[in-house]
Amino acid sequence: MSKPLIISFASKGRDNYLEASENVYLSVKDHWQYDYLFYTMDGNRNEFAGMKLTQITELPQPSTWTCNPHSVTPYQFKFGLIDHAREMGYDKIIWLDSSITLNKCPLKLLEQSNKGVMCFHNLGFETKDYISPECLAILSHKGYLQSNNPPQVWGGCIGFDFTKYSAKRIFDTIAIMSELGAFDNSPTFKNHRHDQAVMSMLFNYYDVLPYNYGHIVTNEHHENKEYGNYYTFVYGRNYRQA
């Protein structure tokens, strides 16, 4: 039997992600009937609105590789937490950043994805403007560079259906690229988008088809319904005021 999971992580960080994540918790409570893992660091609560929060002081680690803290390898923690959850037996895993809320259950969207990878076109942003030369060199050396400007995908909302071999292979490649330095900050290129840039390149290589904008929308388009009302995710929504 399938074991779906939504996973998220929050800390005080650059902004107060602990507070922003309350919107995530409320939307998951309303639109998700399966398991969830809400990790928090440097917070002081074990629950919010009846939703369990898992307090940690250091990142849970997958058994086959070491996940560095964000200060060492930016955003690698997302994939470490996903892989750790995979080892716990979860096989359909959706990652939500603290800026993303649900508008309806996303499981079907993940299950219908062409390679077992649910991702979304980040409309209006081009990958070539947000990827460092060091990252391009790593991807090229490993043979994953098919285009310098494939469609950019959202980094804050991603899903992997590990019941499909293609999703396992793609996820493992992302993790390997993070270990090789493709996520790292560049000393000369300040706009590198770390995991988002790497995923955009690898998804293009593996023929992953991103869902069009409209399956995920910004809060502005949630309010004015310019892209209709069939969307599953909303970026930047204050769910508490919905």
Label each residue range with its predicted role.
Residues 1-67, 73, 87-91, 190-193, ...:
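N-terminal anchoring/stem segment of glycosyltransferases
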Residues 1-2, 8, 18, 102, ...:
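A glycosyltransferase accessory/donor-loop signature
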Residues 16, 45-48, 64-67, 102-105, ...:
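Short catalytic/ligand-binding loop motif for oxyanion handling, primarily in non-cytosolic enzymes
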Residues 23, 81, 197-201:
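Short amphipathic alpha-helical face segments that pack within enzyme cores
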Residues 37-40, 93-97, 102, 118-120, ...:
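A structural signal for short, well-ordered beta-strand segments and their strand-loop junctions
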Residues 54-66, 137, 175-185:
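Short amphipathic alpha-helical segments and their helix-coil junctions
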Residues 75-80, 131-145:
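Short acidic (Asp/Glu) patches
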Residues 78-133:
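GT-A fold catalytic core of metal-dependent nucleotide-sugar glycosyltransferases
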